Amino acid sequence: MALSMKPFRADDSGFQSNNLWVGSLTPETTESDLTELFGRYGDIDRITVYSSRGFAFIYYRHVEEAVAAKEALQGANLNGSQIKIEYARPAKPCKSLWVGGIGPNVSKDDLEEEFSKFGKIEDFRFLRERKTAFIDYYEMDDALQAKSMNGKPMGGSFLRVDFLRSQAPKKEQWAGSYDNRNGNMNHKPQYPHSYEDFKGDVQPSKVLWIGFPPTATQCNDEQILHNAMILFGEIERVKSYPSRNFALVEFRSAEEARQCKEGLQGRLFNNPRIKIMYSNDELPPEQDDTSFYSGMKRSRTDMFNNDPSFVSSPHSTGIPGSMRPLRGTNERSYNGAEYNDVVGKEPNWRRPSANGTGILPSPTGPGILPSPAQGTRRPMRSNPDSWEGYDPAQLVRESKRTRRDGSVDGFTPMGVDERSFGRGSVAARPIRGPPDSDHIWRGMIAKGGTPVCCARCVPMGKGIETKLPEVVNCSARTDLNMLAKHYAVAIGCEIVFFVPDREEDFASYTEFLRYLSSKDRAGVAKLDDGTTLFLVPPSDFLTDVLQVTRQERLYGVVLKLPPPAVPVTASYRQESQSNPLHYMDQARDSPANASHSLYPPRENYIRGAPEHLTAASKPSVSEPLRIPNNAAPQAGVSLTPELLATLASILPATSQPAAPESHQPMSGPSTVVSTAHQSNGLYNGEAPSQAWKRGPQTVHDASNQSFQQYGNQYTPAGQLPPPPSRYPPASNNPNYTSGMVHGNMQYQSQSVNMPQLSPLPNMPHNNYSMYTQGSSNHPVSQPMVQQYQPEASMPNQNYGPIPSYQQANFHGVTTNQAQNLNPSQFQAAMQPPADKANLEPQNQALRLQPMISGDGQGTTDGEVDKNQRYQSTLQFAANLLLQIQQKQQQQSSGTPAGQGP
């Protein structure tokens, strides 16, 4: 037994009280048994029995009577058990008072006025025939002061005021309040006096006991409760006790109460936790209460605050027959097929008409759900695979927002940040409008592919530009705190809100709303164009971040994020793929993470770009390769076909020695693309057009090693075919270094259409692991070319994870003849022949210099850096050709020293 229930012992402290604690009671002991036994010693004000705990409290009017009963009945046998009697410990101070000994001349108003002097009263219940009242204060200090009324005379009698017993006695106070204080106790079992006391049912009566959880705030309002039950018959009185989580409803007859109980059991306000059972006690009369709803003076729940005016439903204007018209329009209606055994089937409630001549169907009204067939019920919507076992049955069912028929007009964008709607403020929309004139979408909201409810989308301000699909599927969730961080970097956002499209969708809509709120999450839905829509429940994110008035709605938010900075080489890699642009993000993201991306596909960022930027994604051999950029196209250096042909012609066809020279180091990285050429401009003797069409060729070296080459060929028009969609695989032969790039690789910059010059075969030696462009047959020694090593960060900046063959340093150039050289022969200097007919003067190679200086100026720092890297690439090629020509001129009169076979 609880500590607060332990009695005082008279022999310990000499304490005496008119309140007796009686213990060792059997579970079968009833209030009538105690009344019969203890009523012999005096008038009893109240008896409170706790059968499950084996004790009771008995309140005598006078202390002397309590003392006499204790001495006479100590150890008496009651229902086979010897009872123990002690003086009860005083009740702990609380906000609830019990007032007894009220004289017959004291009215309810007089008593309430007297006790209201001590503070604001939350609930006042006066039971005249029992000469008892129960008073609940908002503050405990007020109740402590009102306790001083104990023993004060009023109306010819002395008041007895005491605190109600903590929790348990407070729950069962109605058991005593309905007892006959003069000892003429009834023998009927009492109904449960709190929501937790629900254990069973009793015989049918015209009074219904409604037990509800604290979250069911609709039951606190007697007007709403009346409107929900009036369809079943004439209601004499309604009394709600919010602090005790139950209400009493008295019908005109027991038959009407039975119909109401059967029709609303588990379906009242769409809350299965609300329990309805009979009460054999009549609702206490309130002769001094002139209002029909005594509880209407209390403040209603604020669940309807800030809501616009509601259009009443077809059944809110009146009820046929003897039923009185509904008194308000803030009612709820649940009549959807979700709660029928067959979709579309109308409810089957029927009740006798007022004149008894026929049967009238009970129309669907506010707060009433159709009664499904016995044993049948649609399963709750759930998809554990996508939403971590989302079980609506585990959610705490709270109050439901009022739903109205007609269009969703009157919802003005109150307090929304102006940047959410672009430029300027948005004027408030009219409060009234034609039906369905303000919604921009009607469709289905789904969770993980499972339909949740039909809904309408209403814009706030300008709404969203993206067209919503027929089904908005929430495939993932995201934390609201993370969403707030993304909002901080967004350049704007678009806001809408969703409301149930039909009455039967309201339950599942609210359930989904409560689920997101309880998890502090927002649903993530991918739209058809790749835009991400966030479904945000009522939360602090709305009020603190979006500056939107918080209401019980599901909001849709689309963030406008700045486009990420895409490097040139990254854009080029995307353009080199055969898939369209809008598949890039899908291929990059895994299926589980695709719906979480906040950035739409990159095609959204180039909607206004020229047509050639998007057309470049299609592989073509007849158009030059173009590198897209987010900015406007810049005027860059363009090498004409004639100049490129000249550049190819000045490169000798045989291997010649070259001494180490000092060159300007390459200041930036270059983009590596895949090509292959033949030194004479043909592919194995074929015409260029035929060479374009050839597939991959397998070239074998002396060590019988092979690798893939692509038969791309230089054309007079100076055009390049699109590069392959992937890099050639590196060979596993130990003679190849991990950093080798095959002969089908060349340098390519952002805005130059560079043609292929000559083929570069494979090199089966680990001292030379990277080939540069050009068809020169003059090998350059390793120390000279090592000065042109690219920056170590170049591969990571351009391509992310880089294959091993792409991470090596640039070591030198070689020729077709280098295939058969051993390491010692290959490192030997090769001198070009003196009779090379197609050598050009040195100034031909210098022609590249003025063209390099003509590179266009970038509009941003990133583009300037790209242009500088591009210039460095061309500078490297020009310097390399210049050094080769210088060596040719210096050694033209000498004899070659160590020419290869």
UniProtKB/Swiss-Prot annotation:
Region of interest (Disordered), residue spans: 343-416, 655-736
Keyword Repeat among record annotations: yes
Domain RRM: 18-90, 95-166, 206-281
Any single biological process term in GO: regulatory ncRNA-mediated heterochromatin formation
Annotated Pfam families: RRM_1 (PF00076), SPOC (PF07744)
Sequence ranges assigned to domain SPOC in this UniProt record: 441-537
Record protein name field: Flowering time control protein FPA
Organism: Arabidopsis thaliana
Lineage: Eukaryota, Viridiplantae, Streptophyta, Embryophyta, Tracheophyta
Gene name per UniProt: FPA
